[in-house]
Amino acid sequence: MALNVVILAAGKGTRMRSDLPKVLHPIAHKSMVQHVIDTAHCIGSDAIQLVYGYGADKLKLALGEQQLNWMLQAEQLGTGHAVAQAIPNIDDNDTVLILYGDVPLIQASTLEALLAARPDQGVAILTVNLSNPTGYGRIVREQGKVVGIVEQKDANAEQLAINEINTGIMAVPGKALKTWLGRLSNNNAQGEYYLTDIIAMAHADGVEINTAQPQSAIEVEGANNRVQLAQLERAYQAREAEKLMIAGANLRDPSRIDIRGEVTVGMDVMVDVNVIFEGKVVIGNNVSIGAGAILIDCEIADNAEIKPYSIIEGAKLGVAASAGPFARLRPGAELMQDAHIGNFVEMKKAVLGVGSKAGHLAYLGDAQIGAGVNIGAGTITCNYDGANKHLTVIEDNVFVGSDTQLVAPVTIGKGATLGAGSTITRDVGEDELVITRVKQKHLTGWQRPVKIKE
């Protein structure tokens, strides 16, 4: 029996006041609908039907490379009408799971519980109890069993008092779903084809209906405007921060970090305020991350330290390596064990060897730097000739004086010393001292120019 997921994503989202389709608005740098798609993959969906309408070009540009079946809902005539657009891709033996593109916080564990609650050939609906259920469809029960769902605008006074509400998420057998969708009517207060009406049909047909509930009501909250979007963002961040703390991270203030990807942490990780994680970030044990640091798609080994306001992107820090404050590691940069870069040092496609250091104000690009190397302040690897990049190789135990330019391609041999202010254009042999600056002159009796008064 295949799991066929239908995601409703056709709405415009007028209250967002945006040209962007509502489901493309982001939570943690990822569109709401992408969160839902990813969760569908997590539970082992065999197929995903995306019912779309407004903003088709933008949706396809954002999601087009994924394995989705695109089902157009040309007119928005209700949730039942939306699901009906997916019928051509639904087999009778499928279990159909209906999700919503603007409900991004639904968790895989909740959907797995819902699917487990569905009886053989029966229906399972996800419900939640709210102290204030205003605006939501109510779950109508008789002797404890679900017999229907009534929408707010169609409910009587007794039904309005019910606090168990419909989330819209449900699991339904494919064959029965097709039958029930064919019976839907728009004879209601909103003139729409309600998906919720199939629950009363299921009851009338003697089909067993079970319910499940999420761990938290926030999982089933949608975003219709930017205020609600911001509320979902905060809820998502709080949930992800809690995961990090449970895994072994000490967050100085859990409300002042941003997690925009997949973060894995070891034990005793210290994270100061205003740190941002993006993409896939892997952090070892006993790592310290200073305030305002940004970590993007990087790997940080045990005992490493990232000092405040450093940016680590597509890079690696080895055991006990340190970067910052105000350091920048760009893609392809790597600090080996005990290596250090300080403030205003930038690296790209460069390796700084074991125990080597660049304390301040340097650019190291397209460089292979050995162990025990000292890079003086103001050092630049001149790697670009206007058309191509070239490699600089600095072997072990080299001392590079301040304000040195290394014009690539160039190799500096082991133990060499480069005098401050030198411009190196040729290879340097092992243990050589190279000084290329102009000889210092002393002129006695020098008179400074005097400004002429007008």
Swiss-Prot record:
Residues 1-226 are annotated as: Pyrophosphorylase. Mg(2+) binds at D102, N224. One of its GO terms (cellular component) is membrane. One of its GO terms (biological process) is lipid A biosynthetic process. Residues 227-247 are annotated as: Linker. Gene3D superfamilies: Hexapeptide repeat proteins, Spore Coat Polysaccharide Biosynthesis Protein SpsA, Chain A. Pathway: Nucleotide-sugar biosynthesis; UDP-N-acetyl-alpha-D-glucosamine biosynthesis; N-acetyl-alpha-D-glucosamine 1-phosphate from alpha-D-glucosamine 6-phosphate (route II): step 2/2; Nucleotide-sugar biosynthesis; UDP-N-acetyl-alpha-D-glucosamine biosynthesis; UDP-N-acetyl-alpha-D-glucosamine from N-acetyl-alpha-D-glucosamine 1-phosphate: step 1/1; Bacterial outer membrane biogenesis; LPS lipid A biosynthesis. Its main location: cytoplasm. InterPro entries: Bifunctional_GlmU, GlmU-like, GlmU_C_LbH, Hexapep, Hexapep_transf_CS, MobA-like_NTP_Trfase, Nucleotide-diphossugar_trans, Trimer_LpxA-like_sf. UDP-N-acetyl-alpha-D-glucosamine binds at residues 8-11, 22, 73, 78-79, 100-102, 137, 151, 166, 224, 330, 348, 363, 374. Its EC number is 2.7.7.23, 2.3.1.157. It comes from the Bacteria. Its cofactor is Mg(2+). The active site is at H360 (proton acceptor). One of its GO terms (molecular function) is UDP-N-acetylglucosamine diphosphorylase activity. Acetyl-CoA binds at A377, N383, Y384, S402, A420, R437. In the N-terminal section; belongs to the N-acetylglucosamine-1-phosphate uridyltransferase family. Homotrimer. Catalyzes the last two sequential reactions in the de novo biosynthetic pathway for UDP-N-acetylglucosamine (UDP-GlcNAc). The C-terminal domain catalyzes the transfer of acetyl group from acetyl coenzyme A to glucosamine-1-phosphate (GlcN-1-P) to produce N-acetylglucosamine-1-phosphate (GlcNAc-1-P), which is converted into UDP-GlcNAc by the transfer of uridine 5-monophosphate (from uridine 5-triphosphate), a reaction catalyzed by the N-terminal domain. This is Bifunctional protein GlmU. It comes from Shewanella sp. (strain MR-7). The gene is glmU.
